[in-house]
């Protein structure tokens, strides 16, 4: 996302600069749009006045968005930084899929809004462009576009956060999926940890066979060792079968050679256990070894799913 991300952030900051100049102020420690947010968010009002705070380094979704300070409460009714971090962490794996050039700007305009004298929401067309590009990727993981980001909530003709002219978004849409998204993962220790935290279960697994079934890939394990059981009951472990959702016809190169052990992560959707990430279990790989060390002591944030 490199250049596109910074260009998008620059557009957002240009808007911010213009609005700040109009308000004859250079920086707001306390901003004055409490009643506006309350009116927009179903009449909800907050006990503390909105304030500008630094975007912390561990708010991975927005730390490098291009500006350094944000408003709390944010535009999704999160009143504390702990709540923002918990909810935002579930979006980091999607951001890494690069499904749309505007994903980070759109999400951060809500999770970590730039400090202005009134709330500025993302443009409806930006929401629709990100949704249309990213929801097909989300569906591989058993997710749909969440109610809290419903695009008709956002302004159409008013001042709003935009990164490019509306007709330029078409060029940034992916031209079809080449690799099954759960198989297209960066082999970096931090990225694997993020996937682990966003997944409900994790297993070390030897795979017996892979079949096509009803548009999915069906993965039959041979041997498995739980690293994180989550919703899997011990009695279910013996007969466990995994599915790569909508993956019947997209390649997953890790599954081309089943002689290795794998790190498999996933989540339960209804009665199915879906694969959300797969890596070759490679102790010789430096990044994988780093992940193994971090995993022993790493505490994932606990959060209620924002996708329900």
Curated annotation (Swiss-Prot):
Tell whether Glycoprotein is among the UniProt keywords. Answer: yes
Disulphide linkage map: 52-115, 62-108, 99-134, 123-160, 127-151, 180-250, 183-252, 197-300
| Tissue localization of expression | Highest levels in aortic endothelium, heart, spleen and eye. Lower levels in lung, brain and kidney. Weak expression in liver, skeletal muscle and the medial layer of the aorta. In the cortical brain, localized to neurons and small blood vessels. In the retina, localized to the inner and outer nuclear layers with high expression in the neuronal cell bodies. In the heart, restricted to myocytes. In lung, highest expression found in the epithelium of terminal bronchioles.
Complex formation: Interacts with WNT1, WNT2, WNT4, WNT8, MYOC and FRZD6.
* Gene name in the database record: SFRP1
Record's protein name: Secreted frizzled-related protein 1
Q: Name one GO biological process term.
A: Wnt signaling pathway
**What does its UniProt record remark on the domains?**
The FZ domain is involved in binding with Wnt ligands.
InterPro entries hit by this protein: Frizzled/SFRP, Frizzled_dom, Frizzled_dom_sf, Netrin_domain, Netrin_module_non-TIMP, SFRP1_CRD, TIMP-like_OB-fold
The superkingdom of the source organism is Eukaryota
